[in-house]
Amino acid sequence: MAASARVSGHDRGRDSRSRLIRLGLGASIAGLTAVLMVAAFPPGRFPEAAYILAIPGLLWSRRRPEWRLFLGFLFLGLFTGWVVLIWWLHHVTWVGMIGMSGVVALFPLVWFAAARFAMPRLAELEVATRITAVLGLAGLWVVLEWARMHLFSGFPWLPLAASQWERPILLQSAAFTGFWGISFILIFFNLGLALYLVRLVGFVRRRNGRFCPEFYLALVFLFLGSFGLYRTATGQKREPLMRAGVTQPYIPQVIKWDPSEARSILDTIYRTTLNLKALEPTVMFWPEAVTPLAVLGNASMQGWVETVSRDLDAPIVLGGIAFSEDDGGAELWHNSVFLVKPDTGLSPVFYSKRHLVPFGEYIPLRRFFPWAAKFVPIGGDFTPGDTSGLLSVNLPERTLSLGSLICYEDVYPALARRTTLDGAALLYVATNNAWYGEGAAAYQHAAHSVLRAVENRRPVLRTGNGGWSGWIDEYGLIRNVLVNDEESIYFRGGSVFELDRDRRWIGRLSFYTRHGDWFVLLSFVLAVTGAVLLVRRPYDPLAEVRSTK
């Protein structure tokens, strides 16, 4: 009896230690996943972390951990990573920041759940079937990024491809596949490297192992998506486009809509703008909703903007509010971009934002949630636009079709693509990131503009109220960024950028612009095919052991 009790106690102690080891491993995987996420995306300076971001979770999945343990710790890691990445959102809403982090963490968690199911089963598959299954996992990642873009109005912030925003050599595939292709290459490399490491461990332990075709296929994809396509960026024939003046007034959000501060705000805009007159800008650009009163619908505000354009002796492209009434007398508010010319004044053609921010610019189902009105800074809902609203900007040697995107519209590739299809030669992003403090938000936001430039082979010019202001060429190269003497983007000032373009893309459309999100459909087919191949075969736990012999 005593011996039995001692054995039982020993077993309990061993089980307890084993449990602690599993918990420690799970916590380590969660922490490492969060660290790699934060390092990979701006303002992190280690985009190469995206090549190994999923590997801790993938290697863990090969050990067949308990489902609850696996999903629980990976959710913790993904959630923590997102909290750090969108920490800036707490300036607007703590609840929204925490809730959004949890929601967006669910999408990669679904992918890791699929990997937990697939990874132990890959060993029992023939080479062709195994490669197809791995391609299916990579395709599933793309499908989940697409779903995150569309569900519940969408929050496509920081897809995996955005990690490479300062690595133009890998971005060129976006002109063919959209940013989806970049995400596919990166996650497939994670899968290939993870499987290679598994084989390597098997070789070290048993001095034998098999060829890992998935890893070498990942290298092929990486080469084709980078060096193989980078040649498209060589042999450029660049020509001057314009001298773009950029005004960054850096109006604090707490006073932006305060009527008592209106005169001070206008004086700041005027001084910051006219300080650039000696640099002879061809066109001046102001950020989103820059004026404290509506530009359209307020005669005095319109007159003031027209006066500034005449004093500057140059056209001004500015973000502002448009106010009007419909036939029934109901108020209509638009978040818009206008063109003001020194000779003719405010152009009747303007762009209105098409994708509004829920609970920021309108309240979904307002009649069911009237209490939510306190979260909207302007009393009523904004009305979305429904066209690209191209602005015809007269330059000394040509008339330029300018396509506008407001605030976070540049995170939606379909909007930039539609604007380019309608004839835009230059994409302009007017934004106001002052809502989110001086953290990572502006850098992360700019990363999406880089993707839009490459996808559509159009230069992108950005002006922010407080940063990030600059321009990106058709190949994703960041050509200029407005910074102060301390190299900070967060300041009040302005500059004039010499914009140019590659003549080879004048009037031409990229493959992606012409054909859209075809790669998402391909990824869906791969994901379904891979799932069918895995589900059809029962799991053999001894297959992995046999595969290394």
What are these regions (language model features)?
Residues 41-57, 248-250, 280-294, 430-432:
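Short, conserved active-site loops that position catalytic residues or coordinate cofactors/metal ions
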Residues 151-154, 238, 328-332:
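Short glycine/proline-enriched turns and hinge-like loops at secondary-structure junctions
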Residues 2-232, 437-438, 449-453, 464-466, ...:
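Membrane-embedded alpha-helical bundles of multi-pass enzymes
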Residues 286-548:
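Solvent-exposed soluble domains appended to multi-pass membrane proteins
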Residues 111, 115, 270-273, 388, ...:
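Generic structural signal for well-ordered alpha-helices
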